[in-house]
Structures are given as structure tokens and as C-alpha cells.
Amino acid sequence: MDGKFACGRGRNGRIMRGNIVRSEEWVVMRYSSVLDLHTHTVASGHAYCSLREMAKVASEKGLEVLGVTEHAPGMPGTCHQYYFDNLRVVPREMYGIQLLLGSEVNILDARGTVDLPERTLERMDVVIASLHIPCMKPGSKLENTESYLNVMKNPYVNIIGHPDDGRYEIDYEALVQGAKEYGKVLELNNHSMEPDCNRQNAVENDREMLELCKKYQVPVVMDSDAHFDLLIGEFDLARNLLEKLDFPDELVLNRSVDAIRRYVNRKI
């Protein structure tokens, strides 16, 4: 039932949303979410809200965990490495929710080089690795795929961010099998599927990725990629695609804190 949602309460009483599934006797929620691990504040340079504003809205929307993953220094206009080195001074709980503070690092080449040093990465609560046009120009299908597979070897990288951008042609079979081998999570990025997003062919690429994740039992996480507080936890497009594919609920890590715990660097 695309586009229709149910509300229910998590263990802490907060409201969660998910797709409605009906039978003759009951209604259950599919793809409910207690977390959003990919968001940005003003520190990223092209986002519009403070950390407090983001945390407050996340709490009001019923999330239990908010990941704040500022763009790493290779992205024009973002914060310096010193920002990430100093995250130790920021509390990990605000407005009753847990914060995972980290970075969306930029993959810089086919070797999987990223733009923060290991001594900084090892202190991050969560690390997303992504391809961005200002930081790495699209290469061949092999080169683009190798960039993902090599960054997966980095022990501090947890999530592969928006691997759905058709400007970077990749081998999705290799991507999914690599995620399984290295224990990484593939992101289903809601923003990628929005009509005004610059990423190309995202829905079709996400569909292919999800079918392979289903085949090989590889987990995914829905993320908003919010650059404004009201977009936190907005996963309607991602949920609808999951529903169309009848994607297994147990492979969507948003369902509970327990589900995501082993995939992030700071234990929650």
C-alpha cells in the first residue's frame, strides 16, 4: 500500500512511522525507524540548522538515535579537520536522544583514499564514505567500483553513502558482495530519490542494489541526508521502494538500536 503509513510506539513510548500492512485480523508496521544516521548541520557549509535544532526536531519526531555526519574537509565550504578532532567536547545526548557524531568522508580515488586521517577517523562515532563530484570525478565502471570496494577495507568506515548516483557507473553485484565480505552497511538514501536531486537514475539503481541485498542477505539503512532539520527521519520514498520490492524487514537496520549497534564505532 504505497504512500500509506501507520504509527506505533517504540519501547520508550516514542511515535514511529512505517508502511501499513493489513490482514483480516491485524495491522502491522513495516520499515519503522528509530534512527537517522546521515544528516548535516551548518558546519557542513551548505546546510542550514544547528546541532541543537537538529537534535530537538529528531526528538520531536520520535527518533532514538541521530547521526550527524558533517562533510569532511575535501568538500568545498565544509569544516576543517580540527572540527572533527574536537568533537569530544560535544555531549552525546540531547533532548533525550543519543547522538552519533562523525563524518561523511569523501572517497578521493580508486584506491579508496579518504580525506580524514586514521587518527581522526578512529575517534568518530560513525563514518559514512561517499562519492561526490567536487572530490572525485567519475571514472570507468571498474574504477568507480574499485573506489567503493577499497574504502570498505577501511576499518573505521561503517556505511557506504548513496551508492546510487548514476554519474558513477558501478557493478552492483560487486558492491553488494563487497559489503557482505567487509561487514559494511549500504545506504538507501531518501534524498537521492527526490526529483530535484542532482544524482542520476537513483531509483533504478537502488532497485538493483536492493534486489541484490535481498539475494545475498546484506543489510541496508534508510537515511535522510537531511541538510535542514524538518527533513530528518523523512523516508517516504525509501519506504515505498522497499515495499514494492517486498524487502525483508530484518535487513533494514532502522528498526531498532540493537539492530544498528554492531555496525557503528561508538557503542550505543
Regions found by a protein language model. Name each.
Residues 26, 64-65, 77:
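Extended recognition/assembly regions associated with phosphoester-bond processing machinery
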Residues 30, 72, 77-188, 192, ...:
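Extended substrate/RNA-proximal surfaces in nucleic-acid metabolism proteins
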Residues 34-44, 68-71, 160-164, 224:
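Histidine-centered catalytic micro-motifs
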